[in-house]
Each structure stands twice: as C-alpha cells, then as structure tokens.
Amino acid sequence: MATPLIDDDELDDLEREFVARVRGRVLEIGAGDGENFGAFDPDVEWQGLEPDATRRAELATRAKEWRHAAVPLDAKAESIPLPDHSVDAVVGTYVLCSVTDQAAALAEVRRVLVPGGRVVFVDHVQAPPRTLKRFVQAVATPIAKRVCHGCHWDRDTEQALVEAGFTGVDVRRLRVRSMPFGPVPMLLFDGRAPGA
C-alpha cells in the first residue's frame, strides 16, 4: 500500500489530533515557543523542556497565557531533570530529529514515564532507500544540523522508538507535499512505554 500523500493543513490537523490524546502529567520535550498549547486537553498538568533560551522565554510567557503553572525547564531531552516515573505522557513534535543522541533521549523519556505511559511523537523521517529524497536528505543534513537547531533530516525515528522499547498504538507514515525535491516523509507515533 502506498504511503498517503497529504498537504500541510492536513498534517497540522493530524498533529493536533495526536497531541490532544495525552492526559494527566504531560512532559513536552523541545517545547519550542508553545506551538502545541492549543492542542492539549485543558486539564493536562503540563511541563515543558526547552534548551534554547530565546524560545524558552517565549514558552514561559505563553505557558502563563494558557494557565500552565510550571516554569519551562532549561534542559535537553538526553538529561531530563525530573524524577523516575513522574509523568503520564511525553510529547515531542519535530524534536527527535534534532536531539544529539536519540537513544539517550528516548531512554530518558522511558525513565520519567510511568510504566505503560503514553508517548506522542511527530517528526520528519528518513526517506526510502534509493530515492531522490533520500539523496537530498544525505546531502542536506550536515548543513541542516548547523542552521536548523541540530536537525537531522535522515533519521529512522520509528526504528529508534522500537529499539527504545515503545510499542506503537497508532503509527502513521505519511508524505507531505513539498517542493522542489518532492514529498517529505513523516511519522506520527502514538505509543506506550513497557509495563502497562
């Protein structure tokens, strides 16, 4: 079966749908400047993690506007300053592409999640082998890492999630229309940590 091809608006709707699923104590890693606040259920107890000082300042302002009590944490996903089993869910949109070490970040996510906790990740991912898009990703990634907050356009994020022990409940592989080098492969992953 062919991977569905969608446009940016359809992707935005799916992102909001996936983020809206989380409940309870929620950690958002790489929370940026708060783009996901409108998608969260109003009853979540939100905590954000953002290593970039400029984004974190904007995030703090927006968190107050959305009535979230927590102050965003200055930390990277590879070293989350929270106790073991302290959150019910972890959300990351366009963040696993830019962490320094995916395996270390996902190990930290597992550590802070309660057993059976939920993970929701949305990210662009590695294109299929022997495609123009895969070639473009290989050429562009060294540049993107320097100018796009460490972004790797060529990561196999789904495999990293599986290797970290997460089980997909709703996993969608999509392609988003893009020019000039063709559609961007995307992954939407709603899953669980071990121990449910």
Put a short name on every predicted segment.
Residues 186-196:
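C-terminal lobe and adjacent flexible extensions of AdoMet/dcAdoMet transferase-like proteins
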Residues 103-115:
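A short glycine-rich, Lys/Arg-flanked "PGG" loop and its adjoining helix->strand segment in the class I
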Residues 25-28, 32-79:
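Class I SAM-dependent methyltransferase SAM/SAH-binding core
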Residues 2-9, 122-183:
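C-terminal alpha-helical "lid/dimerization" subdomain adjacent to the S-adenosyl-L-methionine
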Residues 5-25, 35-39:
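Conserved alpha-helix/loop element of class I SAM-dependent methyltransferases that forms part
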Residues 88-101:
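A short SAM/SAH-binding and catalytic strip from SAM-dependent methyltransferases
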Residues 45, 116-118:
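Short glycine-centered segments of the SAM/dcSAM-binding site in methyltransferase folds
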Residues 78-90:
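A short acidic, Gly/Pro-enriched loop at the edge of an enzyme's catalytic core
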